[in-house]
Amino acid sequence: SLKMDCPTVYRKGSWWLMTYLLFDGRGYETWLAKSKDLLNWKTEGRLMSFSDDSTIWDANQKAGYNALTNSAWGGNYQLEKYRGKYWMSYFGGNQKGYESGPLSIGMAYTEKDPATAHQWQRLDQPILTSSDQLVRWWENKKQFKSTVIWDKKLTTGYPFVMYYNAN
């Protein structure tokens, strides 16, 4: 049986869109659905699928979360482009099963319409791993769900901030 997890909702024009994860026993894939009313959803298709090449670091786990969503109170909830691309952070891994093996955070992007189901391009290597030199005790096993925000006022001193779950 399939298990659905971690919806991320955003807006494009008159549509609400939702990326979500499906777990089928092998691992996570990232999917897209559309709605006019936030109640009735239509599945559009996959955004990040399993890889045929089992040697790729994220072959069996691709759990994606849209980045740079305009989340201002009363804002438009649309995805924002950076350098002409829409972005998505995701946790990935190459072992089969429920969150099995090392899980790291990667980034994916597209120049196409994010409201249309298509495969997003992924960076070749993860951007955060549990074996990074500066890893701390609470993130030295697995890294999970992440959210990337655009701090245009540089409140934090950086243009982008990632919140993520790890153990």
What are these regions (language model features)?
Residues 145-146:
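Non-cytosolic head/periplasmic domains of membrane-anchored proteins
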Residues 1-6, 10-64, 68-141, 150-167:
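Beta-rich carbohydrate-recognition and catalytic domains
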